[in-house]
Each structure stands twice: as structure tokens, then as C-alpha cells.
Amino acid sequence: MRKLTQFCLGLMLLPIAAVAQNQPTMKDVLGKYFLVGTALNSHQIWTHDPKIVHAITDNFNSVVAENCMKGEIIHPEEDYYDWHDADQLVKFAEQHKMTVHGHCLVWHSQAPKWMFTDKEGKEVTREVLIDRMYHHITNVVKRYKGKIKGWDVVNEAILDNGEYRQSPYYKIIGPDFIKLAFIFAHQADPDAELYYNDYSMSIPAKRNAVVKLVKELKAAGCRIDAVGMQSHNGFNYPNLEDYENSIKAFIAAGVDVQFTELDVNMLPNPKSFGGAEISQNYKYNKELNPYVNGLTKAAQKTFDQQYLSFFKIYRKYVDHIKRVTVWGVDDGSSWLNGWPVPGRTNYGLLIDRNYKVKPVVKEIIKLYE
């Protein structure tokens, strides 16, 4: 009798399990309009943990490296490239039939230590830095030619006030380092899409500067397919009207738009904090970490509303939006737990710490059905 009862219960549960497995995911529905991506860290690209693998492959059809393709990791010494993790990222994507985007070729932060100085520690000349930049871009892009759909060629070269960042690339080469980087990347893989990527893109001064840059690159004959709006957003920012105006401005400038590093910081920020400048670091303060045991109902509602607001905007411009990438797989592995304040518990992504899709995802999917 007990076996019969267990058998009957099993039959009753089968349809429920089947329904759960057949629920449409983001990649199933949103993927009809644009690529749905996530950033992978070095643990995730090597893992065999089925929970992590399924969280990635069930929900996303595109991946990008969180760190392993950045200069200091992939090219730590002038005559040595470390392809170990980057190759595995591409292999993981190929195994699971996912698209790969490359991040990033030229960035002032996490650049190789040797890039800007000679053996005596003196600043290199313009000619030397151009040559080093050329070889770095050429070797990295050619290695993954035909395997990577597109590259963030230059990352974060413009400040929030619209001026050029005074990076070593800018100081040594001048503003044309951006144009040269796009030329070198295109020469290395003529079929790869090329992007300019930056944060705080809803700020009007920054928006205008990026539009100007796009037009200058196009006038110079450079290939630039899209602007990447990183979208490291928060529970009370950005201003949605400004955010949408930037989308419209970039489209009007003749390029597509990609949302390349989407997350929603649910924690209060230090008073002087702004943007997504990775060099900003602050001491831990428990007042800045209010949700150690989970979001309150009010905070969860705000989280849901923010994500729904962004995806409602994206829905309006699907003809010009080619990719939306969330910056991380799950809350537990998100960079937001350690930046800009270390040791916090944040909830900025669409998959929770148990690798379960959050309820708001169903509402996002409904927007596109």
C-alpha cells in the first residue's frame, strides 16, 4: 500500500516538475529580440557544479569575461600571454552554443604594469606605446578571430563631465589612441563588431562627449558598431528620462546600443561615491550594509520596479539593441559585494545566492511575450 501511495504521489508530481522545467527563460523569450548575456568569473568558466552551469546555460545565450581578458591577466608580461582562462571561456561558450563578447582591449585600469614604462621605470614614448598597444590588440583579437562576436575596444576613456580621462594612454599618445585602437582591432579581425564601453552614460555631458566620439570615429572611417552602456545602476538611479535620452542619442549618432554590465546596487552608498569608477574604495560601515539577512519587502519591491523599468525601456528600442548583459551570474558572486565597500551583502542580479531565478524575471519575460 505504501509503495502504491508513493507511486501515485510521484505521478501527481510529474506534471508539476515538467511545467517547472518547461517554463520559458530569459534567453527563450528575450533572446528573440537581443542576446541575453552574463559575465563569468574564473571559477564559473571551469566549474562542473550543475547548479552553476544550469544557472548560466538555462538563462543566458551570451557570455563575457568578467576579468580574464583584461590586460593585466591575459598579457602580464610584454613577451608572455596567459591564455589559460580566456581559452576556457571560449571553450565553455562553444560547448554550450553561446555567443562570446570580448572585454576589453584598452582600459586604463587593470592594464599590464609594463605597458607604460621601460625597464628603468621611465615613461615610454608615444611611438613605443602605440607599438605595444598594436601588438597587444592584434595578438589577442587574432587568437579569437571567428570565435568572438565583438570587442569592447576602449573602456571608460571619458569622464562624467565629458572630458577625456587623463589616463596614461591619453597622456602619452593623445586622444587619437582611441581611433588607433579601433583601427588595430578591425585589422586583426575585420568581421568582429567593435564597441566603445563606459559607465554613467545617462549623464548629459558624458552622453554628448560619447556622441561626439562616435561621430569622429565614423568620420575617420573607423568601424564602430555600438556603444556599450554599462548600466551599473542603483535602487534610486539613474534618472530614467536621462537614461532613455542617451539610448536615443546614440542611435541617432548611427550606432546600436548594448547594455553591457547591468546590475542594480541595492545598498546605500558613501556620500562621496558616484558612477562606477573601480578605483573608488571605502571602509566597511555596518550602516552601509543593512540587508545582511535579506531585502525588506519594500526594498524587494524597489528592486523589481527598477529592473522592470529598464527592460520596459529596452523593449521600445529592440531594433537597435543587440545585447543585454547582466554583470554576474548570481548575487553571491557579484562584484557588488566587495565594491565600493568590502564585505557587504548585495542583491543586484536576477539570480539569487541559491542559483534560483528571482520572481521579477517572470514579469520581465511577460514584457516580451
Swiss-Prot record:
PROSITE patterns for the chain: GH10_1, GH10_2
Catalytic activity: Endohydrolysis of (1->4)-beta-D-xylosidic linkages in xylans
Pathway info: Glycan degradation; xylan degradation
GH10 domain ranges (all copies): 21-367
Top enzyme category: hydrolase
Disulfide bonds, paired cysteine numbers: none
Pfam family membership, one: Glyco_hydro_10
Keyword vocabulary terms for this entry: Carbohydrate metabolism, Glycosidase, Hydrolase, Polysaccharide degradation, Signal, Xylan degradation
Family label: Belongs to the glycosyl hydrolase 10 (cellulase F) family.
Name of the protein in its database record: Endo-1,4-beta-xylanase A
Organism (species): Xylanibacter ruminicola
